[in-house]
Amino acid sequence: EDLMVAVIEKGAEVGAHILSGAVIEPGPLDELLPGWKDQPPPVCVPVEGDQIYYLKKNGRFRLPTPPQQKNHGNYIVSLGAMCGWLAGHAEAAGVDIFPGFAAAGIRYTDDGAVGGVIIGDMGVDIHGNPKDTYMQGIEIHAPVTVLAEGCRGHLSKELISKFELDRDSDPQTYGIGIKELWKVAPGKATPGRVQHTVGWPLDRAIYGGSFIYHMEDDQVAIGFVCGLDYADPDFSPFEAFQQFKHHPLIKPLLEGGEIISSGARTITEGGYQSLPRVEMPGAILVGDAAGTLNVPKIKGTHQAMRSGMLAAEHLAETSKPAGFDERLRASPVMAELHKVRNIRPGFHKGLWKGFFTAAIETITAGKLKRTLPQHADHSQLQRASGFEQPDRQWVERDLAPRDRLASVYFATTAHDEDQPVHLQILDPEVCTTRCSIEFNNPCTRFCPAQVYEMVEDVDGPRLQINAANCVHCKTCDIKDPYQ
């Protein structure tokens, strides 16, 4: 019996909401589409060399490339374009794709199982009233729903909680990745070059680093990832990224160029010990919705693809979710996560101890019996009154964008100012009382799009939500200390 497969895509087209610029391992693609290199995706550059540096404010030194970050045989791609390219292959195989529709809720059957998704109402104003363009949402019924909505998706979050899928796993931990695609001056990009840095502008207590992927046509994808388990309530990941761009190693590459696009998205960093159960009545989780990203490799695309392919094989054979969790955990996806399971939590005690742990785990291929624990990111934030600010030695900036609002201009997300506010605070009074005193309103700094802003009214300070700025990175949902 043939299965009907439908993909619900919230972007106007497949790939529209994907942050482009990534290095992929081609193994799963080789299995899925043998001969794909004869007709590759629109942007596909073989990696020609790796560089990794430790940065100080005005200096640097080259580090040996760890085995996990050696990219010989891998490809630099535009991930958005690659997703669109894959969509064409899927449609040719009979998959129905519906772009421009966001799954707003889960449809449950009478016995409490997942029975599909609910597409939200469209054409509603900020007060919830229908406009001329109103279209009522619809229910999509399905015997099995595959959640592939990425990191901290709101439907996946609901299901993980409802079915207690994380009951036997550690708390998930995350990073915030901010990325820009630049058109640099002719001759500055070296197609195929992959660069990573650690160190400045981060202090040694904050996990993170950068990536620069050199593509063709004078384009480079440049980005910065910060672990969201940081303690400093005044830290701004966006500012750290902009500071990094002004390092003497990086700034000459960007001077004379221009930003093409930008965006931000959280990534799952918990790995092996934070992976929830990935099956439930009527549904399964794949990719970053489950948390399959390999942090030491700084890669998740091949893991997401492999988990999706396993899901397809499983459902083609059984037509039901039961057994998929066992299948995933017995697969190369889980084996890859197990080998590196202690590297990310090894950095909880700082950069140098993290490097030492990473070296031990790499040498032993993760065969030591220990498994280091993960902690919920929001629990790691310290009170403002008791936190001693480090001297970050940050510099004056002159590269674009000038601030977070200017960065939002280049993002691929767009909102109607009159649409319903999708960000809701359960108790706004906490923001102006407890949070102001205890944490100095960290949301005004950890948000990369300046969605949250403390303003003075006649009645005193209040938190203003600039929802139209939102780039849907999910940082606020993760780092809010009160949850």
Residue positions per predicted region:
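Extended, hydrophobic alpha-helical segments in both membrane/secreted and soluble proteins
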Residues: 279, 283-289, 301-315, 443, ...
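A short alpha-helix-loop-beta-strand transition element characteristic
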Residues: 33-49, 100, 166-174, 321
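Active-site-proximal substrate-binding core of FAD-dependent oxidoreductases
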Residues: 2-4, 16, 291-297, 309, ...
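Ferredoxin-type iron-sulfur electron-transfer modules and their immediate structural context
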Residues: 41-56, 331-458, 479-483
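Flavin (FAD/FMN) cofactor-binding core of flavoprotein oxidoreductases
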Residues: 252-273
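N-terminal FAD cofactor-binding segment of flavoenzymes
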Residues: 2-58
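Short FAD-binding loop at a beta-strand-to-alpha-helix junction that anchors the flavin cofactor
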Residues: 216-218, 277-296, 448-453
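Predominantly flavin-linked oxidoreductase catalytic cores and closely associated redox partners
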Residues: 2, 10, 80, 84-85, ...
